[in-house]
Amino acid sequence: MTTTLQQRSSANVWERFCTWITSTENRIYVGWFGVLMIPTLLAATVCFIIAFVAAPPVDIDGIREPVAGSLIYGNNIISGAVVPSSNAIGLHFYPIWEAASLDEWLYNGGPYQLVIFHFLIGCACYLGRQWELSYRLGMRPWICVAYSAPLASATAVFLIYPIGQGSFSDGMPLGISGTFNFMIVFQAEHNILMHPFHMLGVAGVFGGSLFSAMHGSLVTSSLVRETTEIESQNYGYKFGQEEETYNIVAAHGYFGRLIFQYASFNNSRQLHFFLAAWPVIGIWFTALGVSTMAFNLNGFNFNQSIIDSQGRVINTWADIINRANLGMEVMHERNAHNFPLDLAAGEVAPVALTAPAING
């Protein structure tokens, strides 16, 4: 009899736990995805902060030339970063227990792998948690679909690109100037600015900013007056009110006359779908572009494409970009290569056909 009571009691504890996990009455929804999301994001955050402040230099290129990224080694908020794991590690999984000592793990950039793996798992669980909460509340599932765009971008630069390039040392450093360095080197090696998918991403981000500003300013300019001149317009809205807080007909009429009639949405649902879809689709394409360039399917190359009747090159903007790319490429990892690939792979140009005679 006692055993039966204990089993029922433990079952009740589990049921109460399940109810609490999936309850939408909690101040912050946990959910089953949250059970994995919370510890992974906490681990990534704690490790990132410690490494950003105090990690020793990392041998990122695998040539015994450590690069310092932490604050106590002389960096500031702008120049500091969690430096990617060593090229000597490559794509090997490098947890703490795989290193001979903690010093070796730090020297080879182990914290970078710890942060990005926990971060990506946590972000994927955050997407799942968005779907889970939407499901519990009876909402449509498009919030997590929109979030998939930044998640795809993070996965592209932290996981897909290193896999394609053969080493986590090619992943994006976790810092401000490290991000810029990653972008510059990416342009040098892959000509990303000439890739159509990156162009779509630029259109998505800048267009999304423009449409967001247009929508916000139109709504703010066509609010239904509910207050006096000496009160804030914001007091004219009560949370949960049934009435429209702005006049969509007035906004439609204004914008339709400013541009032309059919440039203005007359359906609020279509408008807000468009505002969500435009940047999301653009960022999807950029993430897809980075993921294909990871395997060296690069941007367009129009270098020396225009020649005159004598076969001489007429320089275009593409040739200027090519020269800039070569300059950026020869400057990065300058001690790791004798020649950058673009310079070493071309045909050999003879410098002198015969040795000069020295008289005297």
UniProtKB/Swiss-Prot annotation:
SUPFAM superfamilies on file: Bacterial photosystem II reaction centre, L and M subunits
UniProt: chlorophyll a ChlzD1 binding residues: 118
Classification via InterPro entries: D1/D2, Photo_II_D1/D2_sf, Photo_RC_L/M, Photo_RC_L/M_CS, PSII_D1
Extra facts: Cyanobacteria usually contain more than 2 copies of the psbA gene. 2 of the reaction center chlorophylls (ChlD1 and ChlD2) are entirely coordinated by water.
Positions with a binding annotation for a quinone: 215, 264-265
Amino-acid positions noted as binding Fe cation in the UniProt annotation, renumbered to this chain: 215, 272
PROSITE patterns: REACTION_CENTER (PS00244)
Post-translational modification: Tyr-161 forms a radical intermediate that is referred to as redox-active TyrZ, YZ or Y-Z. C-terminally processed by CtpA; processing is essential to allow assembly of the oxygen-evolving complex and thus photosynthetic growth.
Lineage: Bacteria, Bacillati, Cyanobacteriota, Cyanophyceae, Nostocales
Name of the protein: Photosystem II protein D1 1
Entry binding sites for pheophytin a: 126
Positions of the record's site feature: Tyrosine radical intermediate: 161
Catalyzed reaction equations: 2 a plastoquinone + 4 hnu + 2 H2O = 2 a plastoquinol + O2
Single GO BP term: response to herbicide
GO molecular function annotation: chlorophyll binding; electron transporter, transferring electrons within the cyclic electron transport pathway of photosynthesis activity; iron ion binding; oxidoreductase activity, acting on diphenols and related substances as donors, oxygen as acceptor; oxygen evolving activity
Site (Stabilizes free radical intermediate): 190
Subcellular location: Cellular thylakoid membrane
Site feature: Cleavage: 344-345
Record text on cofactor binding: The D1/D2 heterodimer binds P680, chlorophylls that are the primary electron donor of PSII, and subsequent electron acceptors. It shares a non-heme iron and each subunit binds pheophytin, quinone, additional chlorophylls, carotenoids and lipids. D1 provides most of the ligands for the Mn4-Ca-O5 cluster of the oxygen-evolving complex (OEC). There is also a Cl(-1) ion associated with D1 and D2, which is required for oxygen evolution. The PSII complex binds additional chlorophylls, carotenoids and specific lipids.
